[in-house]
Regions:
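N-terminal phosphate-binding loop and adjacent alpha-helix
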Residues: 33-81, 123
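Glycine/Thr-rich phosphate-binding loops that ligate phosphate moieties of nucleotide
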Residues: 1-42, 86-134, 173, 195, ...
Length: 561
């Protein structure tokens, strides 16, 4: 039987990762990764222009370079006939809007705008559009209350239109010069195919597109120019999940070293792309993408409002189902912050002497502790709260430290805090009538930190099923591109069959330890007390401190302008 192959590319926060898979059984024949040269720009632009607080930008050239490098990387490592490659697909963090000119060229490539932050990609964790998000939420309550539960009661600054409105308010010259505002996933797909198609999943997930309604009509109450974007600066045919967005042009095929005319499937949000790779093609378990941040995704046959979800929309995850998206704005980043900023020299030396990472050394020590032994508890809001409060002006807190507190106690408290945050999200779904019986987990931390996974299972009191150590979203895109190609080209016509053959769950399982349930129930109640006190308005000290910090930084920023 002739073998066929597909390529998936996962564009994450810091790097892009590609896989080349055999369609018949999902075997990953090669992998490649390319970090972004400019990384996440939160302090200054490449030209030296300083950035205001809460900015998180990316450079579009990094995406082009990473796509070229990773595709050539997987081709070089795989001993296959390139003519047997039948399709490719890409997933992206979102919302990551980018203003482009009539030729589809990013405005930051134009010398007129290279010093303007608003001409660059706004990364998902760009939280500087908080005012715009809050104002759009107010307008939603007044003019479109049916949309409120679709965004968990409050629109996030991570969504598409708050970021675009920020461009309009703060850089009208960039807004006027833009022919279109595109999700970077749509932009890159259009460059490969030469058309102006858009991904339905990106439009529904972060731009609140609804079938029969379109993009939010309330935009006209925010600013007539914002509403005027629809059909003009936001335009294109919406392509369904796992469908053909276009075909690889001759020029781009030569650039990538691929056959011209192969299928390019619609781009997809990164967390959603993991579901078919984790064997999820319908209602049932939830997928947890455990990366720098976390995203918990599940599908259900009906719409049930859940507090703090970032998106409950039809067709944002799997065709014909409502996708429920929520998560934590810091996850692996939180543990990484502690290691890079706070771990003492003796921990780093011990890790070096044992030839292990600092994370492994801290986990080894933390594993000896019992629940509650450290006397610590934390609110895991180092990057704001995505769910259930949807408030990016909240900040992290560690309570209970003494002069005897040890590094491993803090490290474990951070892991437990992330577990409590996840349990809070799960409880919100359960209260709404959306059951979650198990989590299928992907992301590097899921197989690099067994202690963390066991703690999560103990705290949420549910089993965890772990993916293989692969870039799971990229594998998911190989599955979706195989479906887009169809059986006539050596792919699949049904997603169920494709996922059954190509998914990448491992044999690793974590079952909750019932002996720790009572201790974690008690600690969780303390977490909820702090969560509600600091997060629901009883004490806004976190926001006052952020405002004070922002004011001081704005003064410094103004001096550089």
């Amino acid at each position: 039987m002739k073998q066929t192959y597909t390529i998936g590319v996962d564009f994450g926060t810091q790097s892009a990762r590609a896989v080349l898979c055999r369609v018949s059984d999902g075997a990953v024949l090669s992998e490649s990764e390319c970090p972004y040269a400019h990384g996440v720009m939160s302090d200054r632009l490449p030209c030296g222009t300083p950035l205001p607080p809460d900015y998180a930008l990316q450079h579009p050239q990094d995406f082009l370079d990473a796509l070229h490098a990773t595709v050539h990387g997987v081709l070089a490592k795989a001993d296959i006939n390139r003519a047997d490659i039948i399709g490719m697909g890409m997933d992206f963090t979102c919302s990551t809007p980018l203003p482009v000119d009539k030729a589809g060229t990013p405005l930051c490539f134009d010398p007129r705008f290279e010093r303007n932050p608003h001409a660059y990609i706004k990364l998902w964790k760009h939280h500087a559009a908080q005012w715009e998000a809050a104002r759009l939420t107010e307008l939603m309550r007044e003019h479109d209350p049916e949309l409120l539960p679709c965004v968990g009661g409050r629109l996030s600054p991570e969504a598409f239109f708050p970021k675009v409105w920020q461009v309009l308010r703060e850089a009208p010259d960039v807004f006027d010069a833009a022919d279109r505002f595109l999700e970077v996933g749509d932009w890159l797909t259009q460059r490969l195919t030469g058309n102006e198609n858009l991904a339905r999943s990106l439009a529904t997930h972060k731009a609140q597109y609804r079938e029969g309604v379109g993009y939010p009509p309330l935009l006209r109450y925010a600013d007539p120019r914002l509403a005027g974007m629809i059909g003009a600066k936001v335009r294109g045919k919406l392509i369904d999940i796992g469908a053909v967005s276009g075909y690889l042009t001759q020029q781009r095929a030569a650039w990538l070293g691929l056959p011209a005319g192969i299928v390019v499937t619609a781009p997809h949000p990164d967390a959603m792309a993991s579901l078919p790779a984790l064997g999820i093609t319908g209602p049932g378990p939830a997928a947890l993408a455990a990366g720098t941040s976390s995203a918990m995704i599940l599908c259900y046959s009906q719409f049930l409002p859940v507090e703090g979800t970032t998106s409950i929309m039809l067709d944002n995850t799997l065709p014909g189902l409502y996708g429920y998206a929520s998560g934590q704005a810091a996850f692996g980043d939180l543990l990484g912050w502690f290691v890079s900023r706070c771990a003492p020299e003796e921990v780093l030396r011990a890790a070096q002497d044992a030839h292990i990472s600092a994370h492994e050394e801290l986990s080894r020590r933390a594993a000896r502790l019992r629940p509650g032994e450290s006397g610590l508890i934390c609110l895991d809001w180092w990057n704001g709260n995505r769910s259930c409060l949807a408030d990016m002006r909240l900040s992290g807190m560690l309570l209970g430290m003494t002069l005897q507190t040890r590094p491993e106690e803090i490290y474990r408290a951070l892991m437990e805090g992330l577990g409590f945050g996840l349990r809070c999200i799960i409880d919100a779904h359960e209260r709404a009538g959306v059951p979650i019986h198990a989590l299928h987990v992907s992301g590097g931390i899921s197989y690099k930190n067994p202690l963390f996974m066991q703690l999560l299972s103990n705290i949420i009191q549910r089993p965890l099923y772990i993916s293989k150590p692969l870039p799971t979203p990229a594998v998911g895109m190989t599955i979706l591109s195989a479906c887009a190609a169809g059986t006539q080209k050596g792919g699949y016509d049904q997603l169920d069959e494709a996922a059954a053959r190509m998914s990448c769950l491992s044999d690793i399982r974590y079952q909750p330890d019932a002996s720790q349930a009572a201790a974690y129930d008690a600690l969780y109640q303390e977490y909820i007390a702090l969560h509600d006190y600091f997060g629901r308005g009883a004490n806004d000290v976190m926001k006052r401190l952020r405002d004070l910090s922002a004011a001081v930084k704005e003064q410094a920023y103004a001096k550089h302008e």
